[in-house]
Design a protein with these regions (language model features):
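Hydrophobic residues embedded in beta-strands of well-ordered beta-sheets
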Residues: 24-25
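Extracellular/luminal Protease-associated
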Residues: 38-52
């Protein structure tokens, strides 16, 4: 099993990345503030517009380290990656299957079905821990019906309809799962670009990080993150990463954010409310989020398909590996990640 190394998150917008030998150096206003050997990291995510030197880009490329640039608010800008990994036969098969409507529909049914079941399992866990709730029970029934229908969808348009129905039911009752700081963290449904409340700001931020991790994992196992089966092909869009993150959103993103709020690890003071420009995290809030995110990635679970201990941060890699095996026909079906 691949070892989970650290992802270096550079949250200071004024930071500039350069190299010194085999070290990544971070400077602010031309003063060095941090350095780390490349052998200790597997990825760099930087939030800001100062950029990085060509030397550090080459250093990352040569050592298989993904270098991702996000805006200070967490919106994806670009990614630097090295030579294509994996063998050409795997990618050729991936491209063929992407054009196979029947095969693509089958695999995206599984992904969306898994996403809906993970929504359901989060709600069922609340009932198990805190007792019956009429609104949550109704939402669970909608999710169970949506999953059954999704697994029988005749085309992708129909499938997306069931996914939308499930998401609406789930997010409608999500505020019930916020047990502490309810008045500080109101939630009235999913919104973005820009997010209008702190919960949506955290959801969008987490989903960006997940998509980045999945794209890097796909590249690692030799798949093309830009050619998917559900999300349409578009220049610059990592369609397969967006496909595969669907099953991971609830566990990696939603549960993490609920935990942050309920354990009071983050507060309303960690956000800036900018009216029509939406809500963003303060520098302190961003660091609080990232620190907790990194700690969460180091936690260990039993993978439901492999029945092996896996660090949570390796879940994107494990699912990418399983997708590669399925495309090569080494396994009979793609095992989506399902939480308990």
């Amino acid at each position: 099993m691949r070892k989970l190394l650290n992802t270096l998150y550079v949250t200071t917008p004024e930071a500039y990345l350069s190299k010194d030998g085999l070290n990544v150096v971070i400077s602010v206003q031309q003063e060095e503030v941090f350095r780390i050997p490349v052998i200790n990291i597997e990825g760099i995510v930087t939030f800001g517009y100062m950029g990085a030197s060509p030397g550090v880009m080459k250093l990352c490329s040569d050592n298989g380290i993904s270098l991702t640039f996000l805006s200070p608010q967490g919106r994806f800008i670009s990614r630097v990656q090295g030579a294509t990994k994996g063998n050409v036969l795997l990618r050729k098969k991936q491209y063929q299957l992407s054009d196979d409507a029947s095969w693509s529909l089958h695999v995206v049914r599984l992904m969306i079905g898994g996403k809906i079941q993970n929504y359901r399992n989060i709600l069922r866990r609340y009932i198990r821990d805190y007792g019956e709730n009429e609104d949550i029970n109704r939402a669970v029934q909608v999710l169970e019906r949506a999953k059954r229908d999704a697994l029988k969808a005749q085309d992708k348009t129909e499938l997306i309809g069931y996914e939308g129905m499930a998401s609406n039911a789930y997010f409608e009752v999500l505020p019930i799962l916020i047990l502490n700081q309810k008045t500080d963290f109101p939630f009235h449904g999913r919104n973005r670009r820009p997010p209008k409340d702190a919960v949506n700001a955290m959801l969008s931020f987490a989903y960006t990080l997940i998509a980045n991790d999945v794209a890097a994992a796909l590249e690692t196992v030799g798949l093309d993150p830009f050619v998917g089966f559900l999300h349409t092909l578009r220049p610059g869009r990592t369609s397969l990463a967006l496909d595969m993150m669907e099953e991971l959103r609830a566990y990696l993103g939603d549960r993490f954010i609920l935990s942050l709020i309920n354990k009071r690890q983050i507060s309303v003071k960690d956000f800036l409310f900018q009216g029509d420009n939406g809500v963003v995290k303060t520098d302190k809030g961003k660091k609080t989020f990232i620190t907790a995110w990194q700690a969460r990635k180091r936690e260990v679970i039993i993978h439901p398909y492999l029945n092996e201990k896996v660090e949570i941060g390796l879940l994107p890699y494990v699912q990418a590996m399983l997708m590669a095996r399925y495309i090569r026909q080494d396994i009979d079906d793609y095992p989506v990640f399902l939480i308990k």
